[in-house]
């Protein structure tokens, strides 16, 4: 185990981020946590950067009959990425992809309304944006979230997580994203095994953290 819990992991990630990108705090940074666990990570990173904390939600698109297997992901603005190899290997139809995209977008809208709690979506143009999650496995959900943020034309866009798979890092790097991780194990088998406490984060906790962050410095 490398991390006691997500708060500990977030603090370690913040140290790594500041060491890798020392000028980041001077680029009007904003941290976007990926719910649910990434919001706890993001809180610690935002504190270290003196930056506001906000949220971005992306949803995995599950394979037919095996929804735990992601064939892609979709972000709130409709940005969608697909894993072409898996789609082809499973023979997933365009009709199925459109159907599940509509379903997951509806869930995205519901979650964004719940998490945002009436707050406006921040303007990311020209800012340094750090997308924080509690880990990176395949990277498909991160790709959708990052592509969505990229449309907002930030000056700098970084994906940051305490533990990342080598494959996930390569995938994001190949698309031009800066990736910062505390640890990239050669034998990655899952995000949770690197945490002593990887208890599920509730929607209520996410909402409370975001509300508290909203009352802090801009």
Listing of model-derived features with the role each one plays in the protein:
Residues 1-218:
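PRPP-associated nucleotide enzymes
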């Amino acid at each position: 185990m490398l991390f006691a819990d997500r708060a500990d992991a977030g603090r370690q990630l913040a140290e790594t981020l500041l060491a890798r990108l020392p000028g980041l705090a001077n680029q009007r940074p904003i941290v976007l946590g990926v719910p649910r666990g990434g919001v706890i990570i993001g809180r610690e990173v935002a504190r270290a950067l003196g930056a506001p904390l906000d949220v971005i939600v992306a949803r995995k698109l599950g394979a037919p009959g095996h929804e735990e297997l992601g064939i892609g992901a979709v972000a709130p603005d409709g940005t969608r990425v697909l894993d072409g190899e898996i789609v082809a290997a499973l023979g997933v139809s365009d009709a199925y992809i459109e159907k599940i995209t509509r379903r997951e977008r509806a869930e995205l809208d519901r979650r964004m309304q719940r998490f945002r709690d009436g707050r406006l979506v921040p303007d990311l143009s020209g800012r340094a944006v750090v997308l924080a999650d509690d880990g990176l496995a395949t990277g498909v959900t991160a790709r959708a979230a990052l592509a969505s943020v990229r449309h907002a034309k930030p000056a700098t866009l970084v994906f940051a997580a305490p533990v990342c798979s080598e494959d996930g890092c390569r995938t994001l790097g190949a698309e031009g994203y800066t990736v910062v991780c505390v640890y990239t194990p050669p034998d990655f088998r899952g995000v949770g095994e690197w945490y002593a406490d990887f208890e599920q984060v509730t929607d209520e906790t996410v909402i409370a953290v975001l509300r508290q962050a909203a009352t802090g410095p801009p």
